């Protein structure tokens, strides 16, 4: 109810302002993808995006990566992945207009990456290929001033100690970007939140 009230309030105040939502798909809600799309329409949202749950990193304020028990609470089992694949294929057919209009942010092929990701967690196949240039076109600044090349990789510095420009152009930061191969890096290969923005700059 609070989410619906907030979305309505935004639309009343600025009807032209786009209101987008992201649904993290995990064990408790993977069967509800069609309901998520219907609810997004009911709320008057402009777009809905789906994302797999990150179960392998120490990002998002986790002091340590999750243990196997915690991962199993969130990630899909083998049987659930099979059911999820069917749900995704059905959604692609039944919500074709939402894919075509961009209301569902992901393309059908990109949405199919989600069950592939959970299959890989269960040891059944490879993770979807990573295509990402986040460390070259963006940065993450945390509440305490920590600067990271993305949500998942280690810190490059802190705004309370150096200006952002100095951090991003430091020898360590340049070397990190120069050496990073997103298709082979173990952190990148399991990433659920890739970014591909514009043409990658020539600078390291």
What are these regions (language model features)?
Residues 124-133, 140-204:
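Flexible mid-to-C-terminal extensions adjoining Fe-S/redox cofactors in radical SAM and related proteins
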Residues 1-148, 154-159:
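Radical SAM enzyme [4Fe-4S]-AdoMet core and its adjacent flexible, acidic
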């Amino acid at each position: 109810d609070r989410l619906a009230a907030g979305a309505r309030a935004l639309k009343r105040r600025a009807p032209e302002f786009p209101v987008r939502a992201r649904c993290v798909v995990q064990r408790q809600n993977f069967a509800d993808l069609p309901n998520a799309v219907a609810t997004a329409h009911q709320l008057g949202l402009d777009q809905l995006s789906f994302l797999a749950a990150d179960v392998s990193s120490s990002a998002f304020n986790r002091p340590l990566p999750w243990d196997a028990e915690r991962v199993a609470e969130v990630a899909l089992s083998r049987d659930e992945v099979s059911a999820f694949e069917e749900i995704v294929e059905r959604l692609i057919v039944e919500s074709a207009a939402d894919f075509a209009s961009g209301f569902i942010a992901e393309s059908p092929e990109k949405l199919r990456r989600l069950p592939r990701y959970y299959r890989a967690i269960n040891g059944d196949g490879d993770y979807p290929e990573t295509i990402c240039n986040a460390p070259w076109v963006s940065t993450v600044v945390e509440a305490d001033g920590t600067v990271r090349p993305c949500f998942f990789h280690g810190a490059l510095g802190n705004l309370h100690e150096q200006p952002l420009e100095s951090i991003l152009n430091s020898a360590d930061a340049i070397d990190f970007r120069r050496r990073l191969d997103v298709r082979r890096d173990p952190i990148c290969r399991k990433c659920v939140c890739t970014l591909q923005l514009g043409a990658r700059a020539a600078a390291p």
